[in-house]
């Protein structure tokens, strides 16, 4: 347990990521356009982060509120933005996302949208509100709010057919490669997955045939309306997807199950066993071989670690909570370590071999206490913005979280789920931790 002197009510280099979560989730719908109802800076900040990380065109618009419109109200700005998007981009869905400016002002955006919907409009499209102040919450909160907003726009609640389909509600921590791997696993059992939102079809780094002013793929309206035709809803992460899964269950009667993680041997064993139970199909042989390869990689992990290895983790609340309570303790036990201590302030696991232990400190990478503890760490697991502090402390770090990789390439192709993803993650983290191989420093 850290001493009271190290717990400081201060934050250094604070970064608000709620708008990034919404900006990443909403374009996962096909022919969809998110609009930030606020100043231009509220939109450009999140847009710069997403474009720099994924090296892709991110569709994101703004109502461009100024001093006058912020004082008198932003209904005219919303009406103009919706009309321009419909005429120029011809989108099927338009999401109005409130920002810290409009939430503080108290704009009745729902009333604005009702009045806008009653006005004559060219064609047919859907509009929805995604309320959440930018001054609160992390990217996981923005992602969850966006999913809840999507849940309120369904028009069909009945079962369309009796096909063997299931719903995959993805979390904000999943990369396009992770979602693609989950889809392949589900399809191998004869099921037809409907991913919501499907960012893998537009952030996977492909070259389109034609220019598109919005996302190049994603979950279609027809697929979203067919969520009620599925036999089960699989949600990932306890705070992001379950509210939407509960809404699907209330509207359509589709049961849901939540998996905290899909990284690790036991977690994937449970996932494949559940798919085997739901589909009635045996587990494909290739996953048995991948499981054997993962076991071989896990056997070599304790032999590479040197005495006194420490790993510091810095991430958002939900990834850290899941990582410490459900991920790293169980994963460390699978890799040959035993959990010795675990609480909200930190976690530590002691190896059966005397003389070394693995620890993880639960503090944001921007706090002074975390920096002081990380000085003794052998590796730092955090998002790409932690590279600045890691460079000053001369500590190798593995990029994990959102934003994923602002200084490198291939952020959307990083795989961490399934047997293959877990095996690759062991190798990526094991290199700097063991001190053998590339110990990459940022900068």
Curated annotation (Swiss-Prot):
The keyword Metal-binding applies. One of its GO terms (biological process) is nitrogen fixation. This is Nitrogenase iron-molybdenum cofactor biosynthesis protein NifN. Pathway: Cofactor biosynthesis; Fe-Mo cofactor biosynthesis. [7Fe-Mo-9S-C-homocitryl] cluster binds at residue 42. The keyword Metal-binding applies. This protein may play a role in the biosynthesis of the prosthetic group of nitrogenase (FeMo cofactor). SUPFAM superfamilies: Helical backbone' metal receptor. Signal peptide: none annotated. It holds the Pfam family Oxidored_nitro. It comes from the Bacteria. InterPro entries: ChlB/BchB/BchZ, Nase/OxRdtase_comp1, Nase_comp1_CS. One of its GO terms (molecular function) is nitrogenase activity.
